[in-house]
């Protein structure tokens, strides 16, 4: 009997690779993964083990577990009863404390707990100091001075004194931000843990927890990535042609951005996404869609820039990579070179002692496709991909568009649960009821389980690719959550557009022909306010004007920040500081505060920002001329011009024009600039140099190269 790989032996005796690996480890035989080789003597031992356990194992197990399970459970209950009491007691205490704190906060803020006059006042009951300091306190969105005092077991007056020493004037009911709470807590050596509270609009609030026993194995979701022209599309088409069409007789294949194939009763979902941009966009929106990445590398071309980019994307998403070495049927194919180059990027082939699976194939002829699919199934088995089909569906949008006949159409990938026709659904910031579902071969279906791509209609608007979706119990809840999410997004967009700072004035959107900066000016005395306002309004920059919407004497207050936020303004403070509330509000509202002590520095800063706000004007300046005296043709580089600088200088980052007989025949950029064998940044008049022009090779002796730069005209 010859040696066999783990997965081959597992396949032969119809047992999973994981069971074989576990059995080998029990026999003290070390194996790393399903691709490891098994020696002959080990195969014999495995044969004996699995043949012996084939029939009687089930009966023994049943007999054993049948009698023992109730006893074990009873023992566990008896053993764990005492500690659980203590734990439950502690939990109840913590919950009671938190509940009391919440009630007390509500009483302090006079918002919700208006139950009557018989209650004791908060000051009488709330602030009984505790003896011991806690190790850790929890912080949600904010915490009042009184609540912080109670958490720390201190008198509120003590906390207020400490805040005064930090320059923060606060009352007992005033809310503190996280930084301030951490500062005060650190004074007592107490840690602050931030607790994230899910809002009504967040899907996490409506998530159903899955029990381990409800989870079932689901098909893997595979994305194919790689460099342009390395055969991604051909590979997808080849898999679709050999597996989808033959398996779906009479089915009309339509493009919905994803499709499924079936091999030996097991399904695989392929995402037909347009390259890395869509992959990255989905990840940026929090959509971890892909389970396995197929990295396509052409055997005749090797690793290219987009290949490296694809590797980095897959690694950042922590997704296993299978390398498909394509175009092996070409005469110039060199798979070993591909392996060598990928090793430099951390993808070491199994044949060389690594963990990355390499599959040589030809997408054009179909050679190696079956082996690739087998490897995908093996990796998915090792990854243990599971989902619960008996719950309300959740997943991700793959594609979405507005169809003239159907309205809003979205391709969804169900990641957990089962989606049914008629389900009330929220998709991103849109909502609706699933009116119709079409699978990847154009057939109408009534339900779709985990890892299944379907095209649905029935949404009120078009969602974005990468948006999450969740099915709700009723249409009323779905509508309210969908509308709330849409409103929240609109507010965020307005907030993002409205907030102006001096740093990002260059990127601000033009509002008609007039551009203006709104300012709120605060100073220590009225004279300074008037002088500063007058000086700012005298700034004369073409096309931009200063609009002072509010002036005042004294510290920058919360009302100043709210006004600035509503008016898209920048706050200027002269010899004054913002108070604690103003700081926290400015951070929350993203309002830019600029503090100065010298008037001319305020003027200079605003003037510079206003100049940057204008569209820059440029003029061309010729910096040098080069005469081409000789040309050299080099393979893989192109034509090198041996030149002599007749005027000025030529630099590596300058623009160039190639002039022949007084006519400009090409305008572009310098690719390489050398003096002898060294790369140089510039070459001056009277020196020789070697030049290559980016994406242009028709250079002849006698040509003139004119070097120029674009200079920004300074506004006056």
From Swiss-Prot:
InterPro entries: EF-G-like_DII (IPR053905), IF2_II (IPR044145), IF2_N (IPR006847), P-loop_NTPase (IPR027417), Small_GTP-bd (IPR005225), T_Tr_GTP-bd_dom (IPR000795), TF_IF2_bacterial-like (IPR000178), TIF_IF2 (IPR015760)
Location of this chain's protein in the cell: Cytoplasm
Region (G1): 226-233
Source organism superkingdom: Bacteria
Keywords carried by this UniProt record: Cytoplasm, GTP-binding, Initiation factor, Nucleotide-binding, Protein biosynthesis
Transmembrane segments: none
Gene Ontology CC annotation, any one: cytosol
Domain tr-type G residue range list: 217-386
Annotated Low complexity bias: 92-101
Family in the record: Belongs to the TRAFAC class translation factor GTPase superfamily. Classic translation factor GTPase family. IF-2 subfamily.
Biological role: One of the essential components for the initiation of protein synthesis. Protects formylmethionyl-tRNA from spontaneous hydrolysis and promotes its binding to the 30S ribosomal subunits. Also involved in the hydrolysis of GTP during the formation of the 70S ribosomal complex.
The protein, known as: Translation initiation factor IF-2
Organism of origin: Bacillus licheniformis (strain ATCC 14580 / DSM 13 / JCM 2505 / CCUG 7422 / NBRC 12200 / NCIMB 9375 / NCTC 10341 / NRRL NRS-1264 / Gibson 46)
């Amino acid at each position: 009997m010859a040696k066999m790989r783990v997965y081959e032996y597992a396949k032969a005796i119809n047992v999973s690779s994981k069971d074989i690996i576990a059995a080998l480890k029990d026999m003290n035989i070390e194996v790393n993964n399903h691709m490891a080789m098994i020696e002959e003597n080990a195969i014999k031992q495995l044969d004996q083990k699995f043949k012996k356990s084939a029939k009687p194992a089930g009966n023994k197990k049943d007999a054993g577990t049948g009698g023992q399970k109730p006893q074990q459970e009873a023992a566990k209950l008896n053993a764990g009863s005492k500690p659980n009491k203590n734990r439950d007691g502690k939990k109840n205490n913590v919950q009671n404390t938190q509940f009391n704190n919440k009630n007390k906060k509500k009483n302090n803020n006079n918002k919700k707990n208006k139950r009557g006059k018989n209650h004791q006042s908060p000051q009488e009951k709330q602030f009984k100091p505790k003896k011991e300091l806690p190790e850790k306190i929890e912080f949600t969105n904010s915490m009042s001075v009184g609540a912080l005092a109670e958490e720390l077991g201190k008198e509120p007056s003590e906390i207020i004194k400490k805040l005064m020493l930090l320059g923060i004037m606060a009352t007992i009911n005033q809310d503190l931000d996280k930084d301030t709470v951490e500062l005060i807590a650190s004074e007592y050596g107490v840690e602050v843990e931030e607790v994230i509270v899910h809002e009504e609009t967040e899907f996490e609030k409506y998530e159903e927890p899955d029990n381990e026993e409800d989870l079932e194995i689901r098909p893997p979701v595979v994305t194919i990535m790689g460099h342009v022209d390395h055969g991604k599309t051909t590979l997808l088409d080849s898999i679709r042609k050999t597996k989808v069409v033959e398996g779906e007789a009479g089915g009309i294949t339509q493009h919905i951005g994803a499709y499924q194939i079936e091999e030996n009763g097991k399904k695989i979902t392929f995402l037909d996404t347009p390259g890395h941009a869509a992959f990255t966009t989905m990840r940026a929106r929090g959509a971890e869609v892909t389970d396995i990445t197929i990295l396509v590398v052409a055997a005749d071309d090797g690793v290219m820039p987009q290949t490296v980019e694809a590797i980095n994307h897959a690694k950042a998403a922590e997704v296993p990579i299978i390398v498909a070495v394509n175009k092996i049927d070409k005469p110039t194919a060199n798979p070993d070179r591909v392996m060598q180059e990928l090793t430099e990027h951390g993808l070491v082939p199994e044949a060389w002692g690594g963990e990355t699976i390499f599959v040589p194939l030809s997408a054009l002829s179909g050679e190696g496709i079956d082996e690739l699919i087998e490897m995908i199934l093996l990796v998915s088995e090792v990854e243990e991909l599971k989902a619960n089909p008996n719950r309300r569906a959740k997943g991700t949008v793959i594609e979405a568009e507005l169809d003239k006949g159907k309205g809003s159409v979205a391709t969804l990938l169900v990641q957990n649960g089962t989606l049914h026709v008629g389900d009330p659904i929220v998709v991103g910031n849109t909502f609706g009821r699933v009116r119709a579902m079409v699978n990847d071969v154009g057939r109408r279906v009534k339900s779709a389980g985990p890892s299944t791509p379907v095209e649905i209609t029935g949404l009120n608007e078009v969602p974005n690719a990468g948006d999450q979706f969740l099915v709700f119990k009723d249409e009323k809840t779905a509508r309210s959550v969908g509308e709330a999410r849409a409103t929240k997004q609109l507010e965020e967009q307005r907030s993002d557009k409205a907030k102006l700072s001096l740093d990002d004035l260059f990127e601000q959107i033009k509002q008609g022909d007039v551009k203006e900066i709104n300012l709120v000016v605060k100073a220590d005395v009225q004279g300074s306010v008037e002088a500063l306002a007058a000086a700012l309004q005298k700034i004369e920059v073409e096309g931009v004007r200063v609009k002072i919407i509010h002036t005042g004497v004294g510290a920058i207050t919360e009302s100043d920040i709210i006004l600035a936020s509503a008016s898209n303004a920048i706050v200027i403070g002269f010899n004054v500081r913002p108070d604690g509330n103003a700081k926290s509000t400015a951070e929350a509202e993203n309002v830019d505060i600029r503090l100065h002590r010298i008037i001319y520095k305020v003027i200079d800063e605003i003037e510079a920002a206003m100049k940057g706000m204008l569209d820059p004007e440029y003029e061309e300046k010729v910096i040098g001329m080069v005469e081409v005296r000789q040309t050299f043709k080099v393979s893989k580089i192109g034509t090198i011009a041996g030149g002599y600088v007749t005027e000025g200088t030529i630099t590596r980052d300058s623009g160039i024009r190639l002039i022949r007989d007084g006519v400009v025949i090409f305008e572009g950029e310098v690719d390489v600039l050398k003096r002898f064998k060294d790369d140089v940044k510039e070459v001056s008049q009277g020196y020789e140099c070697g030049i290559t022009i980016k994406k242009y090779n028709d250079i002849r002796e006698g040509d003139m190269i004119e070097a120029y730069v674009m200079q920004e005209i300074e506004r006056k």
